[in-house]
Amino acid sequence: MNVAGEFTTATPIAGLRALGAKPDVLERVSTLRDVRTGAGGVVHAVFTPSISLGQIPLATTITTLEEDETGARLRVVGRRGTQLVDVDLRMDFKSTTDGLTVVNWNAGLIVRGNAASVGQRVARDITMRAIASVLAEAAQVAGSAVSDAHL
């Protein structure tokens, strides 16, 4: 399944690119907790998206596959028991003339386990909202961290 979205943020591209190396900043995202960086720069966290079914915490790993000034490609894997969400996430960054950053993202994802069969009718909407929400909030906290660093 594929989902995509776009948002605009005041956070500069450099601030977005630095997120993977700053678990203390990612920890400020409301749906992430226990954020740490492991071997090879892999980010480990518990991701708990708010969905209509309640909160479902997923033990999550985020691996940067590619990254440069124009964007990044990440592999995000979330697990809970026998449930698995495997996401290939591509983000493209573009600076605007008024100093903002436009983030276009698209994600190919696979859902495995009971959640795949039970939630297949709603999986697209749930995952699109969860990804859009965590990306936009991560960009916002990255912007706050950049502002705090300049104070």
Label every PLM stretch briefly.
Residues M1-E6, V42, G71, D86-D88, ...:
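Intrinsic-disorder/low-complexity, polar/charged segments enriched in Ser/Thr/Lys/Arg/Asp/Glu/Gln
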Residues M1-H44, S50:
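Hydrophobic ligand-binding cavity/cleft-lining segments
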Residues I13, T37-G40, L65-G71, D92-V102:
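A short, structured loop/turn motif at beta-sheet edges
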Residues K22-P23, I126-L135:
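Short, well-ordered alpha-helical segments
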Residues R33, L58-E66, V87-S95:
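Hydrophobic/aromatic beta-strand elements that line small-molecule binding cavities or substrate pockets
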Residues T37-R80:
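Glycine-rich portal/gate segments that line the openings of hydrophobic small-molecule binding cavities
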Residues V77-M128:
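Beta-strand/loop substructures that line and gate deep hydrophobic ligand-binding cavities in soluble
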Residues L135-L151:
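Short, highly charged C-terminal tails/helix-capping segments
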